[in-house]
Curated annotation (Swiss-Prot):
Protein name according to UniProt: Co-chaperonin GroES
Pfam families assigned to the protein according to its UniProt record, in alphabetical order: Cpn10
PANTHER family: 10 KDA HEAT SHOCK PROTEIN, CO-CHAPERONIN GROES
Keywords carried by this UniProt record: Chaperone, Cytoplasm
GO CC list: cytoplasm
Source organism per UniProt: Psychrobacter sp. (strain PRwf-1)
Compartments, record wording: Cytoplasm
Function: Together with the chaperonin GroEL, plays an essential role in assisting protein folding. The GroEL-GroES system forms a nano-cage that allows encapsulation of the non-native substrate proteins and provides a physical environment optimized to promote and accelerate protein folding. GroES binds to the apical surface of the GroEL ring, thereby capping the opening of the GroEL channel.
Amino acid sequence: MNIRPLHDRIVVRRVEEEQKTAGGILLPGSAQEKPSQGEILAVGNGQIRENGEVRALDVKVGDKVLFGQYAGQTVKVNGEELLIMKESDVLGVLEG
């Protein structure tokens, strides 16, 4: 099963972050925060404006993005946990 987001929504796979603290302490799973960055897997066709025009999204498939800790809705697709969120939930695109 694949998922195709509608309108201004995007599908994001969380990117796992380091599981150690800066001091080298290994964190157990229960103490780890969910990562707030990920890779965009799919994008909708754009935001529908009040006049009916569709504005293309600024993000694209493959972009690495930052988002808020509670952004989006978690879904399972083919056993993989993904996030569906609006483009406006994205705080920024990681470059370089």
